[in-house]
Amino acid sequence: MSHITTEDPATLRLPFKEKLSYGIGDLASNILLDIGTLYLLKFYTDVLGLPGTYGGIIFLISKFFTAFTDMGTGIMLDSRRKIGPKGKFRPFILYASFPVTLLAIANFVGTPFDVTGKTVMATILFMLYGLFFSMMNCSYGAMVPAITKNPNERASLAAWRQGGATLGLLLCTVGFVPVMNLIEGNQQLGYIFAATLFSLFGLLFMWICYSGVKERYVETQPANPAQKPGLLQSFRAIAGNRPLFILCIANLCTLGAFNVKLAIQVYYTQYVLNDPILLSYMGFFSMGCIFIGVFLMPASVRRFGKKKVYIGGLLIWVLGDLLNYFFGGGSVSFVAFSCLAFFGSAFVNSLNWALVSDTVEYGEWRTGVRSEGTVYTGFTFFRKVSQALAGFFPGWMLTQIGYVPNVAQADHTIEGLRQLIFIYPSALAVVTIVAMGCFYSLNEKMYVRIVEEIEARKRTA
């Protein structure tokens, strides 16, 4: 059985306050995540004194570990049948957010060990952080099918989520370094101070999300009691759900491209453009363009459909990066072309969450088993693998191109940074265009038919 409202699930409209609360949840998640994505590699190389390859290995091991903790979270969520008044997903948002906050701060604490000891300690802390972040963030993301079955409202929630994520990224991009610099003469304490302040705000925002969202469609009994969630079942759910599998491949590419860009832009502005403060100012413009894209996304989807808007966003992204590589030699041109690329990425990153929610019903339609947690965390498994590779690749490449911290870089190092921030993301975006254009088949018409057939089955069961 399910907890179901009396309103038609296909037409139910969500209140503004609930959409805002859901968007605030990804504001919280991205504050807690992006301080690490943006600055942790630089903290490892420039403060802890670790070689770039070691920093990359920390990301590789930790993110691969959390890929499996994501899957474990999905299995745990789909195994829950005794659902209390807090719901199926919301309790994990509430209780996991506190250890995530503490560990996000601890990641920026130095240790008095040698290089090996520092590497081991940093890896352990980052793995623990990833474990609790999986519990919090996977529950947050998997909750959408329990909130609404209206495809337009799901697209709206995806837009609000991306808006919150973009605001979190903007705050971390613009504010972290100035806050860190308030502690003069001690870079280590500056990192700790900034991480503490940002993480506490992340905790507060996540609690606001918890209090403002409502679960309406929660399965309390399995459709097939003999079929219990497990790791093998999770991978089968992905392999047997073609739209989900294609979406996983697309995210493997796009998230890897986006995270490499974020990691390298700190080095690019400092060593290529010789303007380290530019990153803070650029954030206002580039993230502003993302907000415009997020704002335009729901109307664009209603007119053209999710798939066409997704591919269109990728094409804009590629155009912006290629223009930056060939013509973006100065600060002004770098900001302008980056804004174009980030504008395109807004459609891609927003629609990922709406598309994965649609694959829940596709999987239920194909198998008779509704597994929000398994589908969502199978999706995030690929995203974490992408993050693992995106964390390792820049650190490894920094060593390969001859990066030396806190000095002027050689010409071949400069060219390596340019290729990392522009050519690598463009190539992955092109691969994604081919994958989504040729192999993704779940459109709006098919989705409506699937939902109608599922509801008909339930009425006759």
Swiss-Prot record:
Disulfide bonds: none
Coiled-coil zones: none
Transmembrane segments: 21-41, 48-68, 93-113, 124-144, 163-183, 189-209, 244-264, 277-297, 309-329, 331-351, 388-408, 420-440
GO BP, one annotated term: sodium ion transport
Pfam families: MFS_2
Ion transport recorded as keyword: no
Periplasmic side of membrane: 42-47, 114-123, 184-188, 265-276, 330, 409-419
Protein name: Putative 2,3-dihydroxypropane-1-sulfonate exporter
Native organism: Escherichia coli (strain K12)
Lineage, top ranks: Bacteria, Pseudomonadati, Pseudomonadota, Gammaproteobacteria, Enterobacterales
Gene: yihP
